[in-house]
UniProtKB/Swiss-Prot annotation:
HAMAP family: Recomb_XerC_XerD (MF_01808). GO terms for cellular component: cytoplasm. GO terms for molecular function: DNA binding; tyrosine-based site-specific recombinase activity. Residues 105-286 form the Tyr recombinase domain. GO terms for biological process: cell division; chromosome segregation; DNA transposition. The keyword Coiled coil does not apply. InterPro entries: CB, DNA_brk_join_enz, Integrase-like_cat_sf, Integrase_catalytic, Integrase_recombinase_N, Integrase_SAM-like_N, Recomb_XerC, Tyrosine_recombinase_XerC/XerD. The active site is at R145, K169, H238, R241, H264, Y273 (o-(3'-phospho-dna)-tyrosine intermediate). Keywords: Cell cycle, Cell division, Chromosome partition, Cytoplasm, DNA integration, DNA recombination, DNA-binding. Pfam families: Phage_int_SAM_1, Phage_integrase. This is Tyrosine recombinase XerC. Belongs to the 'phage' integrase family. XerC subfamily.
C-alpha cells in the first residue's frame, strides 16, 4: 500500500476508533483493489468512474456475496473521500456508483436456555473460569462490542451505579448498566484472579500472563467456552450483542432505549433486532388481540 492508504487506515484507527477486526477488513479491501490496479495497469490517482464500474464487475466475477461487494465499494468510497480532503484535484470515482443492495438477514442470537448453558460452563472453580465468566457476563449483560470490551479500564467500572463507561465508535463515550450477576463476577475476578493483581496497567480484562487481552484473545476464549458446552455450536462476540438486544426487546424494552444502550447513531440500525421468536410472537398476540385473549381465557 502507498502512504496515502496507510495514512487513511491510521486515521480510522486513531480518530474514528475502529476495531482491529474492522481495520483488517479495510486493509484487505485496499490490498485487493491495488492488485486490480496492477493487473489492469491503472493508476490510483487517475482512476475514473468507468474503471470503478469495471472493478464492480470484477468483484462479482469472483462470486462474492452482495454484502461483501457492498463493503468493499464502501471502503473505497470512504478512502477517496479522505483523499479529497488532502488533495483538491482528487475526484471520487465511486461516488456515483450504484451501491449493490445488501442481502437481508436476521441476526443470529442465543436462546435464554443456551445462555444458561454457557454460564454453567464457566462456573468451574478455577482461576481461568473467573476471567472467562467476566468476559461472558460483560458481553451479554451490556451488549458492548468486543473492541469496547478490550479497552475497558478498571476505573471505567462504577460499582455504585452498577455500570461501565465504554468508548464506542467515533470516540463517543456511553454508560451501560449491568446487573447483580455481572457485578459479582467482576468483583470475584478482581479479588481472586492473580494475573490482574500483578499487572502494571489499568486494563480490566487480561490474559493469563497479565497482559491486556486482544480482540483475537476474546474470540479464542469464547470458542473455548463453546467447545465445552453441550448443545451450543457457534459463538462470536457480535452474536452476544445480538442476543443482548433481542432478549431486551423480547421482554418489552423499547427500541430507543436499546439504541442508546448499543450506542447506535441511527434507529434503523437497531431495528434489525426487532425480530422475535415464534413463541414470543404468539405470546404477544394472545395477550394483545381482543378475540385471541377471549379464546385464550376459555
Amino acid at each position: 500500500m502507498n502512504h496515502i492508504q496507510e495514512a487513511f487506515l491510521n486515521t480510522l484507527k486513531v480518530e474514528r476508533n475502529f476495531s482491529e477486526h474492522t481495520l483488517k477488513s479495510y486493509q484487505d479491501d485496499l490490498i485487493q483493489f491495488n492488485q486490480f490496479l496492477e493487473q489492469e495497469h491503472l493508476q490510483l490517482k487517475t482512476f475514473e468512474y468507468r474503471d470503478a464500474r469495471n472493478y464492480l464487475s470484477y468483484l462479482y466475477s469472483n462470486h462474492l456475496k452482495r454484502t461483501s461487494v457492498s463493503r468493499k465499494i464502501s471502503t473505497l468510497r470512504t478512502f477517496y473521500e479522505y483523499w479529497m480532503t488532502l488533495d483538491e484535484n482528487i475526484i471520487n470515482p465511486f461516488v456515483q456508483l450504484v451501491h449493490p443492495k445488501k442481502e437481508k438477514y436476521l441476526p443470529q442470537f442465543f436462546y435464554e436456555e443456551e445462555m444458561e448453558a454457557l454460564f454453567k460452563t464457566v462456573e468451574e472453580d478455577t482461576s481461568k473460569s473467573l476471567r472467562d465468566r467476566v468476559i461472558l457476563e460483560l458481553l451479554y449483560a451490556t451488549g458492548i462490542r468486543v473492541s469496547e470490551l478490550v479497552n475497558i479500564k478498571k476505573q471505567d467500572i462504577d460499582f455504585y451505579a452498577n455500570g461501565v463507561t465504554v468508548l464506542g465508535k467515533g470516540s463517543k463515550e456511553r454508560f451501560v448498566p449491568f446487573g447483580a450477576y455481572c457485578r459479582q463476577s467482576i468483583e470475584n475476578y478482581l479479588e481472586h484472579f492473580k494475573p490482574i493483581q500483578s499487572c502494571n496497567h489499568d486494563f480490566l480484562i487480561v490474559n493469563m500472563k497479565g497482559e491486556a487481552i486482544t480482540e483475537r484473545g476474546v474470540r479464542y476464549v469464547l470458542n473455548d467456552i463453546v467447545k465445552r458446552t453441550a448443545g451450543v455450536s457457534e459463538i462470536h462476540p457480535h452474536k452476544l450483542r445480538h442476543t443482548f438486544a433481542t432478549h431486551l426487546l423480547n421482554q418489552g424494552a423499547d427500541l430507543r432505549t436499546v439504541q442508546s444502550l448499543l450506542g447506535h447513531v441511527n434507529l434503523s440500525t437497531t431495528g434489525k433486532y426487532t425480530h422475535v421468536s415464534n413463541q414470543q410472537l404468539r405470546k404477544v398476540y394472545l395477550n394483545a388481540h381482543p378475540r385471541a385473549k377471549k379464546e385464550n381465557e376459555t
